[in-house]
């Protein structure tokens, strides 16, 4: 029955190896798309033209002539005959399954991968930080010294912030966020991609240690840019008056360039474990998903889920470190100290001791709820944006590189 139907439609006889539905639906769909797109229906007997031989077979709404974006398979299977001009109009020239493209990907240098990662990271960082700035503002208000006397809970902090400054109160320091997050995220992801590519070239280096090592490298370098950005943003969220550049000038006037790095040690203390946990968790989850689905890259929903889980794990474990860092960064603001009262914090150890004395262990969990939500959302959006931007830049770069090499070959 199947053989007779295939002969009538001008298709090859069905291969039972492609019909293990639903586990191999992707393979079956790709194979079917290749055949219907590349090959024309063959008329077995020209004298007997039936409706079946005159019209192409109809497809249900669930079948499409091309794979959706981020699909695991590509219809440009090199095992099929060379497609014609009409086919080339709608297939992507930089299809990841092309042997030539795979060769170009393998030939990418460490620096090329780092630059692609930096470009994608900068775009993803700016988009993500601005999107989630309101959650970060509430988290900072709850973690500031004396916040328990001003805000009874998260909802109270939201209401009072809106009553005091309106919707703009949730976007204090947004200009510093855009500038700082773009550069810091570009440096972070660029360094991580550089580290992954470099460490992968050493066969004796344990594969399982590549993600955490690359994440640590990215955090150490990017923190030098991130700390001044966070300092200005959190000073404004804690009540400092003026615009971002005015707060920056006040810090430089009072404390010099070193004033921009108040809480740098606490930031590293938080960012290193948080960054290693988040980045490593995402890379491990990503590897597990790709291994299970046999895909070359994550689909959007998979990036969101892996990122959210990685962010939640990291935030819940590192909230105490974030509390210490926030106290050190915000307590220097004189107006806030005079308003809320209390002694100044002196270093990481002194801050930990003072929090234990005044608030007990509960003090280290301040703002955990908003922080976990913020981190899960941040990682979900951030890794999704990064993966999307990275694939877009990579495909465009490979396309241009392929065209350039083709032009050189044609000229020669």
From Swiss-Prot:
It is found in: Plastid, Chloroplast inner membrane. Expressed in leaves, developing flowers and siliques. It comes from Arabidopsis thaliana. GO terms for biological process: iron ion transport; response to iron ion. Disruption phenotype: Reduced vegetative growth and reduced expression of ferritin. Induction: Up-regulated by iron excess. Its main location: plastid. The keyword Cytoplasm does not apply. GO terms for cellular component: chloroplast; chloroplast envelope; chloroplast inner membrane; plastid. Solcar repeats lie at residues 112-198, 206-288, 298-392. Residues 1-92 form a transit peptide. The chain crosses the membrane at residues 115-135, 167-187, 208-228, 262-282, 303-323, 365-385. This is Protein MITOFERRINLIKE 1, chloroplastic. Residues 43-83 are annotated as: Disordered. It holds the Pfam family Mito_carr. It comes from the Eukaryota. It is a multi-pass membrane protein. The gene is MFL1. PROSITE patterns: SOLCAR (PS50920). Keywords: Chloroplast, Membrane, Plastid, Plastid inner membrane, Repeat, Transit peptide, Transmembrane, Transmembrane helix, Transport. The keyword Transmembrane applies. Belongs to the mitochondrial carrier (TC 2.A.29) family. Probably involved in iron transport into chloroplasts.
